[in-house]
Regions:
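Extended alpha-helical scaffold/assembly modules in large eukaryotic proteins
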Residues: 5-6, 10-270
């Protein structure tokens, strides 16, 4: 009986351990939440003048250049970072949330496009790198440019009314704005791609690999041409060089086939 009672008492202690741990967790959460709420209350009570100053700055903000929006948003976010919990504190004030969010959206959207365009424009093909990975990298960069313009188009459709209302510049969002720079970057990328394919064609010795390279080059050139709406003079020259190499490779392939056919006919006649 003693053994059983020990087991029962032991089981009772083990069962109570998780309950004690859970209680400690709950106490800790209550204390943390209370401290956070107290910090929010303190900010609401002590930062009122500062927040009302920011409200006036946001409400009166009007821009003609998207770069100025970027600078303003950076400044605003730096100022708001001093609050313990931005959303929780600002909801106690008449904060112009829609305008602040619209400015952030415009600034971040523009910076994202600028980053993509810069990445593509600054790309340098390293001839020491194998051809396959180099071409894949250029394809990946082009897809980023495509997505950037697509996202810009969607953003423009949803944002036009809000941006006009909040005096946020939109000229950078037009087809003649930053999208034109992205398309130019894609054209330059196509030129580098085709030059790499042309250089590689001189090194491969015909066969399926040569044909695959030509197809890759032409397909990429076509995609970029459709996306950008045309090529500049330098890129058109690179395309013509690729086209000439493709014709030359095709003629060589035909000559080899004819030569093989003649050799086969002679051996059969013998």
């Amino acid at each position: 009986m003693r053994r059983d009672s020990r087991r029962e008492s032991g089981g009772s202690c083990e069962a109570s351990a998780p309950t004690t741990a859970t209680a400690k967790d709950m106490i800790g959460e209550i204390e943390n939440r209370s401290a956070h709420l107290l910090a929010i209350k303190t900010d609401v009570e002590t930062q009122g003048d500062f927040i009302r100053f920011l409200i006036k700055e946001v409400e009166s903000a009007a821009f003609t250049d998207i770069e100025d929006v970027v600078l303003f948003v950076k400044w605003l976010d730096d100022e708001l970072s001093y609050l313990v919990d931005e959303r929780a504190v600002l909801k106690h004030f008449d904060w112009p949330e829609h305008k602040a969010d619209a400015m952030r959206e415009a600034a971040f959207g523009y910076c994202d496009l600028k980053k993509i365009e810069s990445e593509a424009s600054l790309f340098r093909d390293d001839p020491r790198q194998p051809c396959g990975p180099a071409l894949k990298k250029m394809q990946a960069l082009f897809e980023k440019l495509e997505h950037g313009v697509y996202n810009l188009s969607r953003m423009r459709e949803s944002a036009t009314g809000r941006y006009k209302l909040f005096q946020i510049p939109m000229n950078w969002m037009l087809d003649t704005g930053y999208a034109s720079q992205i398309k130019l970057a894609s054209v330059k990328l196509a030129m580098k791609y085709m030059k790499r394919v042309s250089a590689e064609l001189e090194m491969v010795g015909g066969g399926p690999e040569e044909e695959e390279l030509i197809v890759q080059g032409v397909r990429f050139a076509f995609r970029v041409h459709q996306f950008a709406g045309g090529f500049d003079v330098e890129t058109m020259r690179a395309f013509q060089e690729l086209r000439d190499k493709a014709r030359s490779c095709h003629e060589q392939c035909q000559n080899q086939q004819q030569q093989q056919h003649r050799t086969l006919c002679r051996s059969t006649a013998c």
